[in-house]
Amino acid sequence: MANVKLFDQTGKEVSSVELNDAVFGIEPNESVVFDVVISQRASLRQGTHAVKNRSAVSGGGRKPWRQKGTGRARQGSIRSPQWRGGGVVFGPTPRSYGYKLPQKVRRLALKSVYSAKVAEDKFVAVEGLSFAAPKTAEFAKVLSALSIDTKVLVLVEEGNEFAALSARNLPNVTVATAATASVLDIVNADKLLVTKEAISTIEEVLA
């Protein structure tokens, strides 16, 4: 099993944490990670695009001229698609772009990205992130003490609201709980900062 150093909030190494190889030590499956990232990005699309077809455009209820005898081409409505101001044919309508992948695929993708971060030495374990009150400056001190100055995803245990509130104004810092972190979140981060409790939760869910 892989061991990673465990730090406290001041950046001091206090011990080490043994990681479960079934979660943090597998061979990353890049193709599965790719599929899950595409799926999650598709789910983020707004999908509110819409145009009016000939039935939705205002006007055009009366035939513009009689069918025969004028010498002009027959027309039934001034809102037909060939008219200026007419309806759009086969235009986009509101829809959801999201689609779900099997749970086994999603779990394998999570294990793959966690394992990749550990292998690349981009996984920082911290004993805990406890704050007496939401303070952005205090959270910034923690990151500075741990020498984290890149885009970071902070994974905390459920109910640690002060950590999330303390980090929300910091650029390049995202906070999520261990149970809700997505593959897209992890891939987008340069480093992971994970509390000891969050590591236990991840192993419980994925092992």
From Swiss-Prot:
First and last residue of the signal peptide: none
Biological process annotations from GO: translation
Keyword entries, A-Z: Ribonucleoprotein, Ribosomal protein, RNA-binding, rRNA-binding
InterPro entries with a match to the protein in the record: Ribosomal_uL4, Ribosomal_uL4-like, Ribosomal_uL4_dom_sf
Function noted in UniProt: One of the primary rRNA binding proteins, this protein initially binds near the 5'-end of the 23S rRNA. It is important during the early stages of 50S assembly. It makes multiple contacts with different domains of the 23S rRNA in the assembled 50S subunit and ribosome. Forms part of the polypeptide exit tunnel.
Similarity-based family: Belongs to the universal ribosomal protein uL4 family.
Protein name, as recorded: Large ribosomal subunit protein uL4
Taxonomic source organism: Streptococcus pyogenes serotype M49 (strain NZ131)
